[in-house]
From Swiss-Prot:
The chain crosses the membrane at residues 4-24. This is Divisome-associated membrane protein Blr. Interacts with FtsL and several other divisomal proteins, including FtsI, FtsK, FtsN, FtsQ, FtsW and YmgF. The gene is blr. It comes from the Bacteria. It comes from Escherichia coli (strain K12). The keyword Phosphoprotein does not apply. It holds the Pfam family Blr_divisome. Keywords: Antibiotic resistance, Cell cycle, Cell division, Cell inner membrane, Cell membrane, Membrane, Stress response, Transmembrane, Transmembrane helix.
């Protein structure tokens, strides 16, 4: 049981870090598109 708990804890940490990385990349990519659309208008 302890190993299962440790594995689930590590999996949750890895998934959360990956989600944070993806979210940060999405946040970084969105602003240029919005600014470009505003400039075209």
């Amino acid at each position: 049981m302890n190993r299962l708990i440790e594995l689930t804890g590590w999996i949750v940490l890895v998934v959360s870090v990956i989600l944070l990385g993806v979210a940060s990349h999405i946040d970084n990519y969105q602003p240029p598109e919005q600014s470009a659309s505003v400039q075209h208008k």
